Amino acid sequence: MDKSFTLFLTLTILVVFIISSPPVQAGFANDLGGVAWATTGDNGSGCHGSIAECIGAEEEEMDSEINRRILATTKYISYQSLKRNSVPCSRRGASYYNCQNGAQANPYSRGCSKIARCRS
């Protein structure tokens, strides 16, 4: 009785696991010389190539996304700052973008707090 219950419980758990897992197809790919995997469930990414191809495509997408975000920024480094052995603005306290006499280096104002040790 005890052995049959253990066998029944094991088979029930196995059937539940098989039913709940997404279907996966595996086949031999002649052109790649290996096994190609593709998920066919709703949770799959839709990639039907080898694992390396799917991961490679994902990495290319991330790379282009990072490059797009970097290029979309408005901050830039001027050509003058990129020249060898040159200082962008030699005036002490002046902004690199507004290197003029009396130009503010930091045009925004902060509130006074204990940590800033400002004098009132």
From Swiss-Prot:
One GO molecular-function annotation for this sequence?
Answer: hormone activity
- Chain positions of site Required for proteolytic cleavage: R68, R69
Propeptide spans which residues?
27-71
Subcellular location, in the record's words?
Secreted
Report the principal subcellular site: secreted
Among the entry's GO cellular component annotations, what is one? apoplast
Post-translational modification, as annotated: Proteolytically cleaved, probably by S1P, a subtilisin-like serine protease (subtilase).
One matching Pfam family, short form? RALF
Answer whether the UniProt record assigns the keyword Cell membrane to this protein: no
**In which tissues or organs does this protein occur?**
Expressed in roots and stems.
Q: GO BP, one example?
A: cell-cell signaling
Q: List the disulfide bonds.
A: C89-C99, C112-C118
Q: Per the UniProt annotation, where are the glycans attached?
A: N43
Subunit text: Interacts with FER and promotes its phosphorylation and subsequent activation.
According to its UniProt entry, what is the function of this protein? Cell signaling peptide that may regulate plant stress, growth, and development. Mediates a rapid alkalinization of extracellular space by mediating a transient increase in the cytoplasmic Ca(2+) concentration leading to a calcium-dependent signaling events through a cell surface receptor and a concomitant activation of some intracellular mitogen-activated protein kinases. Mostly active in roots. Prevents plant growth (e.g. root and leaf length).
User: Which family does the entry's similarity section mention?
Assistant: Belongs to the plant rapid alkalinization factor (RALF) family.
Q: What is this protein called?
A: Protein RALF-like 1
Q: Which organism is it from?
A: Arabidopsis thaliana (Mouse-ear cress)
What lineage, starting at the top, does this entry show? Answer: Eukaryota, Viridiplantae, Streptophyta, Embryophyta, Tracheophyta
